[in-house]
Swiss-Prot record:
<protein>
    <recommendedName>
        <fullName>Urease accessory protein UreG</fullName>
    </recommendedName>
</protein>
<comment type="similarity">
    <text>Belongs to the SIMIBI class G3E GTPase family. UreG subfamily.</text>
</comment>
<keyword id="KW-0547">Nucleotide-binding</keyword>
<dbReference type="GO" id="GO:0003924">
    <property type="term" value="F:GTPase activity"/>
</dbReference>
<dbReference type="GO" id="GO:0043419">
    <property type="term" value="P:urea catabolic process"/>
</dbReference>
<comment type="subunit">
    <text>Homodimer. UreD, UreF and UreG form a complex that acts as a GTP-hydrolysis-dependent molecular chaperone, activating the urease apoprotein by helping to assemble the nickel containing metallocenter of UreC. The UreE protein probably delivers the nickel.</text>
</comment>
<keyword id="KW-0963">Cytoplasm</keyword>
<dbReference type="GO" id="GO:0005525">
    <property type="term" value="F:GTP binding"/>
</dbReference>
<keyword id="KW-0342">GTP-binding</keyword>
<dbReference type="InterPro" id="IPR003495">
    <property type="entry name" value="CobW/HypB/UreG_nucleotide-bd"/>
</dbReference>
<keyword id="KW-0143">Chaperone</keyword>
<feature type="binding site">
    <location>
        <begin position="10"/>
        <end position="17"/>
    </location>
    <ligand>
        <name>GTP</name>
    </ligand>
</feature>
<dbReference type="InterPro" id="IPR004400">
    <property type="entry name" value="UreG"/>
</dbReference>
<keyword id="KW-0996">Nickel insertion</keyword>
<dbReference type="GO" id="GO:0005737">
    <property type="term" value="C:cytoplasm"/>
</dbReference>
<dbReference type="InterPro" id="IPR027417">
    <property type="entry name" value="P-loop_NTPase"/>
</dbReference>
<dbReference type="GO" id="GO:0016151">
    <property type="term" value="F:nickel cation binding"/>
</dbReference>
Length: 203
């Protein structure tokens, strides 16, 4: 049985790697998991997960994309496909593979062949107006995450306005506010994955 692939995208510094680390930490007891990370010229995100996460290092592969990171998750995702296939060969039992994109702009989206589901994450420090810009990553993702809510008072961001703008562009599609450093909002993300991706409660 093929694993479910969840793409995690968003700008540099939004919290993609931390989100993946938290999700694997709190869900790996119930699901066999693996991770592919994308960096332009390094494997820093993979290294972070190996050093700080709960998954064994042979369940994590870092891809060096070079050039534009969005190309590696959409137009030419061959390196990511190869990494996913290698992880499945190493661990035939793997059920969920997270594919973390390199930091990119608001328009970045995953190839539907590479990601069965997608999560797009931004952070409050990037500005209250980010949801209002309506990038394709935010609009088309299955789940939208607005991280670092604790910084809102310091950057003058109104979370109510961000929520309103998000609803305007996403309609009824779900979004979650998080402060991943303190795990705030994380249970909502996990619940969404369990219910909508893993279809818990339907069998």
């Amino acid at each position: 049985m093929k694993p479910i692939k969840i793409g995690v995208g968003g700008p540099v510094g939004a919290g993609k790697t931390m989100l993946v680390e938290k999700l694997t930490r709190y869900m790996s007891d119930d699901y066999s998991m693996a991770v592919v990370t994308n960096d332009i010229y390094t494997k820093e995100d993979a290294k972070f997960l190996m050093e700080n996460g709960v998954l064994p290092s042979d369940r994590i592969i870092g891809v060096e994309t070079g050039g534009c990171p969005h190309t590696a998750i959409r137009e030419d995702a061959s390196m990511n496909f190869a990494a996913v296939n290698e992880l499945v060969q190493r661990h035939p039992d793997v059920q969920i593979v997270f594919v973390e994109s390199g930091g990119d702009n608001l328009a970045a989206t995953f190839s539907p062949e590479l990601a069965d589901f997608s999560i797009y994450i931004i952070d409050v420090a990037q500005g209250e107006k980010i949801p209002r810009k309506g990038g394709q990553g935010m609009i088309k993702s299955d789940l939208f995450v607005i991280n670092k809510t604790d910084l809102a008072p310091y950057v003058g961001a109104n979370l109510d306005i961000m929520a309103s703008d998000t609803r305007k562009f996403r309609g009824n599609k779900p979004f979650v506010f998080t402060n991943l450093k303190k795990d705030e909002g994380l249970p909502d993300v996990i619940s969404w994955i369990r219910k909508n991706v893993c279809l818990e409660g339907l069998t």
